[in-house]
């Protein structure tokens, strides 16, 4: 491969590997579910309708009615011993196992969630 004369020198250093998943609420509590739903459903890439109409629907109806139903569903799958959702648990474990397998000083492996914590 031919090197460009005006291309800056690239210093190679550490490499980061980030395993990202959609996200999950912090708990099965009504407020945590509401906070998560608000963050997720406020993303214009998730809901592509008229933003003014959507804000009314979201804030008047969904964020007042949906957290109770969603909390009930999360309680059925919630990992009580770890106090986290399976999605967060398995995403975090994948990052830890991958880090043990191929991680080193130059290769840092971690995880994040798009919505919720850690994001």
Predicted regions and their residues:
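Active-site-proximal alpha-helix that buttresses catalytic centers in soluble enzyme cores
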Residues: 2-119
């Amino acid at each position: 491969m031919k090197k460009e004369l005006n291309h800056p020198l690239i210093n190679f250093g550490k490499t980061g590997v980030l395993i990202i998943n959609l996200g999950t609420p912090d708990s099965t509590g009504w407020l945590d579910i509401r906070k998560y739903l608000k963050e997720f459903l406020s993303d214009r890439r998730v809901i592509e309708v008229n933003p003014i109409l959507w804000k009314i629907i979201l804030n008047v109806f969904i964020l007042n009615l949906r957290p109770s139903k969603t909390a009930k569903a999360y309680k059925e799958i919630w990992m009580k011993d770890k106090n986290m959702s399976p999605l967060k648990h398995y995403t975090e474990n994948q990052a830890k196992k991958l880090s043990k397998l191929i991680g080193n000083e130059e290769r840092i492996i971690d995880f994040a969630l798009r919505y919720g914590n850690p994001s």
